[in-house]
Amino acid sequence: MNKAYYIGLMSGTSMDGVDAVLVDFAGEQPQLIGTHTETIPTHLLKGLQRLCLPGTDEINRLGRLDRSVGKLFALAVNNLLAKTKIAKDEIIAIGSHGQTVRHMPNLEVGFTLQIGDPNTIATETGIDVIADFRRKDIALGGQGAPLVPAFHQQTFAQVGKKRVILNIGGIANITYLPGNSEEVLGFDTGPGNTLIDAWVQQVKNESYDKNGAWAASGKTDPQLLAQLLSHPYFSLAYPKSTGRELFNQAWLEQQLSAFNQLNEEDIQSTLLDLTCHSIAQDILKLAQEGELFVCGGGAFNAELMQRLAALLPGYRIDTTSALGVDPKWAEGIAFAWLAMRYQLGLPANLPAVTGASREAILGGRFSAK
């Protein structure tokens, strides 16, 4: 059978590494051929975190990081190919998400900015790169996010089955697949892992709360939870999208200023509940019952999954592996899929999801030649 090899590159708001996946799209379902995660070096991570907040000398820092992130993404590709022993000329294209450093779609002139120079990736891998997927949607009046619902629709939708696909990265987003002729919907619910990771990093110097064990040892403070949930984002109507611009360490410190008496683990438990409650509220607005399939890093947090299940008694909950897609690599696969859509000249946004005025072919090609 012919092969249709694409590589997907993803680094999300969690900034916990660059995921590189090699996918074959020749069959009906995407087939995952190989995976690799490239760790983001500490100096680069600190530079990126700093760039996500307004500061001085931004353009110089942006320019340097754009190239450095491009080199890191290229390294991820080259290591993936070495691992899978597949030659670069067998790859049709790389789909690169880049690293988001600003996402401001709701300004009078909205914009989004991802860095990781695709020219650098193309020249250092010898493979054409499809990148800059979000800005066409914004040019058409959309949010530029989330982009994965179109992939979810094609891969996970089934007639007669009401399904919600929940991706929990730094930010959490949901795709509602009604299983009938109703529109597919999708939007960011709010924080996923970003605040629980930030707090465990600040207090315990650990990169994440494994299995939610630290949160499980604490007790949620109802007053703090109510205050966090009063953030205006949670009551916005969709289409909506968010990022570190709204939910970051500075915002968290501001929220915690009146709660100095709380134990650190109680704060962690409350932050985990913020993620779970904001997700559950949005899911219940769409449908009281159905099937929920989780992907992204949050799928591996046992305490999070347990709390979600308690808030959504009408849902059968599993990870996307039950549908044949490894939850760790689902987003990387989605960006390989977006590259394929560009290659085939097919649209990849869902206007009902992003708010764009029409469907569009997303991205641009950066040739290796």
UniProtKB/Swiss-Prot annotation:
The protein's enzyme class: transferase
**What is the E.C. number?**
2.7.1.170
Q: Which UniProt keywords apply?
A: ATP-binding, Carbohydrate metabolism, Kinase, Nucleotide-binding, Transferase
Q: What reaction does this enzyme carry out catalytically?
A: 1,6-anhydro-N-acetyl-beta-muramate + ATP + H2O = N-acetyl-D-muramate 6-phosphate + ADP + H(+)
Q: Record's superkingdom? A: Bacteria
Checking InterPro entries in the record gives: Anhydro_N_Ac-Mur_kinase, ATPase_NBD
Per UniProt, ATP binds at G12, T13, S14, M15, D16, G17, V18, D19
Q: Kindly tell me the pathway this chain contributes to.
A: Amino-sugar metabolism; 1,6-anhydro-N-acetylmuramate degradation; Cell wall biogenesis; peptidoglycan recycling
What GO terms describe the biological role, i.e. biological process, of this protein? 1,6-anhydro-N-acetyl-beta-muramic acid catabolic process; amino sugar metabolic process; peptidoglycan turnover
List the GO molecular function terms.
ATP binding; kinase activity; phosphotransferase activity, alcohol group as acceptor
**Which SUPFAM superfamilies does the record associate with it?**
Actin-like ATPase domain (SSF53067)
By sequence similarity, the record places it as follows:
Belongs to the anhydro-N-acetylmuramic acid kinase family.
What does the UniProt function comment say about this protein?
Catalyzes the specific phosphorylation of 1,6-anhydro-N-acetylmuramic acid (anhMurNAc) with the simultaneous cleavage of the 1,6-anhydro ring, generating MurNAc-6-P. Is required for the utilization of anhMurNAc either imported from the medium or derived from its own cell wall murein, and thus plays a role in cell wall recycling.
What is the name listed in the Swiss-Prot or TrEMBL entry for this protein?
Anhydro-N-acetylmuramic acid kinase
Q: Which gene encodes it?
A: anmK
